[in-house]
A protein has these predicted regions:
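Metal-dependent catalytic core segments for phosphate chemistry
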Residues: 8-10, 15-26, 37
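PLD/PLD-like phosphodiesterase catalytic module centered on the HKD motif
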Residues: 1-2, 9-16, 30-31, 42-214
Length: 214
């Protein structure tokens, strides 16, 4: 029995063709990877994420459904935090699940009223990064290597891979929903520096225990 982080095994040529570009870059055969689907740092990842955030903000301003869910180890990059604050100002609801560093302040009037940040620290050391955007009901989802830190987005080679398979997307969405429903180990990361447990009257749910038997 193995408990591990998320991975994806695919023969989708949209992804494999882009990965070939990444490996050619790493091998020194080309100066910059040219990708159509993968977001690759330090070249297109930051720009692509900002575009996805702006698309959600545009939908919210038009009164259309919108939303962002992020699962990260760390959220430190000031430019990305500003982009999330701007989207919150436009009314985009956001759920952020973090394990470590967080420089974003949730629930600040006029700044981050639509943003909720929680941390789950339990038996297993998690490292998955998932980016989820409502995208007009398309539910665009990425598995990624990068935390939202300046070093990851600007100084390292990192990759965010779009998830196209509907069943894989369904499974990842379920895993996110389980963590968002955790009422045993989840803590709210408050703007005042406190981190109280998130309790409610629902049946006890400990996300990592559910994951173990998933």
């Amino acid at each position: 029995e193995i408990y591990t982080d998320h991975g994806i095994l695919t023969a989708d040529e949209r992804i494999t063709a882009d990965l070939e570009q990444v490996f050619m870059f790493l091998a020194g055969e080309i100066e910059e990877p040219e990708t159509q689907h993968l977001l690759v740092a330090p070249f297109t990842l930051r720009k692509g994420l900002k575009r996805l955030i702006k698309d959600e903000a545009k939908a919210a301003k038009q009164g259309l459904p919108s939303g962002i869910t992020l699962k990260l180890n760390a959220l430190e990059d000031t430019k990305m935090i500003r982009a999330l604050y701007d989207a919150s100002g436009d009314g985009v609801p956001m759920e952020i699940i973090l394990r470590g560093i967080c420089r974003l302040l949730q629930g600040v009037p006029g700044q981050s009223e639509t943003i909720s940040v929680r941390s789950i620290i339990d038996r297993y050391l998690e490292h998955p990064r998932i980016y989820r955007f409502h995208s007009g009901g398309e539910d665009r989802m990425y598995l990624a290597s990068a935390d939202w830190m300046k070093r990851n987005l600007s100084r390292r080679v990192e990759v965010a891979i779009p998830v196209y398979d509907p069943e894989v997307k369904r499974q990842l969405a379920k895993l996110l929903d389980i963590q968002l429903a955790d009422n045993q180990k989840a803590r709210s990361i408050e703007a005042d520096g406190t981190n109280p447990y998130l309790r409610n009257d629902e049946a006890p749910l400990r996300a990592q225990a559910v994951f173990r038997d998933f």
